[in-house]
Amino acid sequence: MTELLSILYKLRIFTSDELSEALKGKVKSVEALLARYKQQGWIVAIRRNTYCMKDIASGLPVCDKYEIGSHLSHTACISYHTALEFHGLAHQPFNEVFVKSMTRFNSFSFDDVDYTYCRQTKEIVGMMTPKGNPYVRVTDVESTLLDCFDRIDRAGGIEELLHCMESIVLLNEERLIDYLARYDKAFLYQKTGYLLERIKEQANISESLLELCRAKGTKSVKWLTNNEESDTFVNKWRMYVPQELTSKEEYELI
C-alpha cells in the first residue's frame, strides 16, 4: 500500500486512465482501488473521473485551484483574472477559475470554487509552465494582460483590471507585439494602446508600441466597456470610455 500511495501522491491529480497507466501490473482493479482510497480518506473526487490526493495532516486536497484548473483537459490553461492572481497582480482573489481549453469540458464547482470553461479554437498564446510547478499551465503576464483587455468581463470588470495594472512594473514589449499580431484584432490593439498608455511611465511603455497600437487599432470608433458605462469619447484613441477614467484634457463629451 505504501508503494501505491507513493505513486498516487506523485501524480497528485489524475483521471482513472492516468492512474491505470501509472499502476500497470500493480493492481487488479483501478476502480476498486479508487473506491477504497476514497472511503479511507486518501482521495477526493473533484468531478466525474478526476481525483486529487488529500493532505494527511489537514485532510484537504493537495492541489490548489491552479493545479486543478490545469488538469481539466490536455490543453487546459489558467487564464484571465485567475492568471493575474497566479502572477501576483490581482487586486482581490476570486472564487472563479477561468480555464482556456481547446477541448471542451463542462464548467463545474468544487470546494466553493467555480471552474469556468473558456472556449479556445486556436493554440493558446503565451502558455507557460512555471519553474518549480510542473503541474500548472498558465498564460504569461503579457498574454494574460491582452486576454483581459480583450475580455474585460473576465478580468473582473474595468475597475478591477485597472487596480491589477497598478502592480505592473515591467512588460516584455517584444512579446506584446508578437501576441498582438497573432491575435490580429484591431479592437484589441485599440484597447491595448489606451490601457497601456495609462501606465506608460510606471511600466516604461515605449512610444513606438503606443504608436503601433494607434496605427493598427483606431480605424473605427469603439466602446471600451458597455455603451451605458462608456459615455466619454477619447479622441486620440477613437474610443468611448467611462468618464471617471479620463482627465479634462483628453476627452470630449458627445
Positions of the model-derived regions?
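An N-terminal domain-start capping segment
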Residues: 1-33, 107, 124-127, 134-140, ...
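Short beta-edge/loop segments at beta->alpha junctions of small alpha/beta modules
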Residues: 1-75, 171-184, 188
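Short gly/ser-rich loop at a beta-strand->alpha-helix junction or flexible surface loop bordering the NTP-binding
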Residues: 16, 35-36, 40-58, 62-124, ...
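A residue-level signal for conserved active-site and pocket-lining positions in enzyme catalytic cores
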Residues: 19, 83, 145
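Generic structural signal for bulky hydrophobic/aromatic residues embedded
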Residues: 22, 86-87, 148, 195
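Hydrophobic/aromatic-lined pockets within catalytic cores
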Residues: 24, 38, 88, 150-153, ...
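Short amphipathic alpha-helical segments with coiled-coil-like heptad repeat character
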Residues: 27-28, 91, 153-157
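Hydrophobic alpha-helical interaction segments
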Residues: 129-254
